[in-house]
Amino acid sequence: MADVKRLGLKISAATPPARATALTVRRRAGRMPDEVLWAAVRAQHPHAQREFEGAVPGRRYRIDIALEAEKIAIEIDGWQYHGKFKSAHETDRERQNHLAVAGWLVLRFTAGQIFKDLQGVSATIEKAVQQRRGQ
């Protein structure tokens, strides 16, 4: 709680103080959700690619984290990019459909899921990898 006050941040009644403090500490440490998930995926899959392009011929889509051999697209969702505006939401759905038609499995995770349950997120990714490899 002291970190929150020292940084001049405000906590609403809807934000539990422990959660707000944890988020503040992570941000101060430079631990953004994409960095945390990238480190976890890369540790298990050295062939993983970040900001992957070329998944859909003729489209300039960029995948946050891609396992190209398995055709698994891992996306980190945040309201600042996905859903703040209706047009962005529609574009995101169109993009996901194009990826699916091209044979990609799209897994979407929020920052909250990554920070609160990285082990569960990693387990979901591993299950998808095993399914894609036919195991």
Please describe what each predicted stretch is:
Residues 62-128:
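Basic, amphipathic alpha-helical patches used to engage nucleic acids or provide basic targeting signals
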Residues 1-49, 133-135:
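Solvent-exposed, charged helical/coil patches
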Residues 25, 53, 83, 87:
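Conserved short-loop catalytic and cofactor-binding motifs
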Residues 34, 58-59, 92:
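Amphipathic coiled-coil/heptad-repeat helices and related helical stalk/stem segments
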Residues 42-73:
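Active-site metal-binding core of divalent-cation-utilizing nuclease and nuclease-like domains
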